[in-house]
Amino acid sequence: TIHPSDPATVFHVVLVQPEIPPNTGNVIRLCANTGCALHLIEPLGFPIDHAKMRRAGLDYHEFTAMTVHKNWATFLNSMQASMAAASGSDQQATPSQPPHSNARPIPFSGRLYGLSTSGHKSPYDHRFLPGDCLVFGRETSGLPDDVQDSLGTDHLLRLPMRPHNRSLNLSN
């Protein structure tokens, strides 16, 4: 269960290879308003400065802790480094926010959950912790197989929806 009234309840929202600029802009706005960090995993289906993405995100870009990662492996390494830094290890953490951002850094819990049509567990039956990562796939094809494999079936969740519909729009 997510407790949105608790100000410490913040997550990492991860978009793997997003394709539609306005959807990503809307998620930027969502993250700015909820205090979540946003991670974009390349390749993106558009340039990071795409006008439609900026327009959909309104003026919230500077209030979002957003990081663009070259690929899934780079993202995982970055998150492991941030955990090591938080625990006092010698490794340097990659910042989870741009230098101009007013957003605060969000610690990583070490737990990643993919939301996928191939998931079997409901997120409503799960207790999320601050710092958890919620991983979403491409708008047209969902989470790539390698990402699903790295998460494992116990960490794939399925949002309830009608049986023959293929996806929900996270940005709505």
Predicted regions and their residues:
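Post-transcriptional modification and biogenesis factors for structured RNAs
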Residues: 1-172
